């Protein structure tokens, strides 16, 4: 497994909005981690995203 070099959490008020920003992130090298979370307090959807060190050779 490659080392995570960057990590962020995307959030949006709708699933459709989250889908748009997650797909935009994927197009520039971000990868989703796990599933989508929803906060009943903020009424937002969340997706963890990471970039990995692709230069590491883990044999």
Write out the residue ranges for each language-model feature.
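Terminus-proximal functional modules
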Residues: 1-59
